Amino acid sequence: MIRLLTVLLSVFILVGCSQGSVATTNTITDENTSEVMGTVTPQESHLLVEWNSDAMDRGNHDFNTMTHSELVVEPYNGKLQRGDVIYYQMLDSELEKNENLSKMYLGRVVGLPNETVKIKGGQVYINDEKLDAFYGVATSLGLTKEEYFETVNLKNINKEEMEHYFNTSMEPIKVEENTVFVLVDMWWRGTDSKDFGLLPEENIQGKVLGYKK
C-alpha cells in the first residue's frame, strides 16, 4: 500500500511539473528581424528622416543620424509585422506633458491587434508567452541585466535605479484593432506604449527600412 502511494505521488509530481513547464516555456520567436540595420538606396516615394535620440541605441548609436546617414522610411501601407521600426506622430497627450518631446518619433512594433502584451521582471510576454527576441527584454545599450552589471563600473551608476529598470513590469494591455503596441529599444531613454498605451494606426507615417546608402 505504501509503495502504491509512493508511485502515485511520484506520478502526481511529474505531471504537475510537466504542466507547470508548459506555462513558462512557451515562447514567441522572431527570426526575421535583424538586430543590426543595414543601408538601402532610397526610392522617390521614400522619406528621409533625421533622428537624434538615443532611445533606440543598442550600443552603436543605432538609428542616430548624427552618427549614421539619414533613415529611409517607406510610407505606411497598412502592413506591419512584429519587430518593424516605425516612424510615427507622437500622441498629443504626451506632447502636452513634455514640450521638449519630439513630435515625430520612432518605436518598434511589439504587440499586434488582438494580442495581449504584458511586461514582467523586464521580460515581454505576448498572450502569456515569452517574447524571445532581442527587443523583448529590458536592455541598456543592448546589454541585458547580467551583461550590464558585469560591464559597468558600479561606482558610476545608481545600482538601485538600474536594478529597478531591468525588472520593469507592466500590467497586461489588450491591443485593439487599428492600433499597435510599440517600445523603444532602450526603454528608460524614450517614450512608448509603456507610457501612453496603444498607438493608433492613423499616427503611423511609415516603416524604417535602413540607413541611406
Regions found by a protein language model. Give the residues of each.
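Protein maturation boundaries and topogenic segments
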Residues: I2-S102, M170-P172, R189-K213
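Hydrophobic beta-strand signal
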Residues: E70-V73, Y87, K118, Y125, ...
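Active-site neighborhood of phospho(di)ester-bond hydrolases with catalytic His/Asp-centered motifs
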Residues: L112, F181-D185
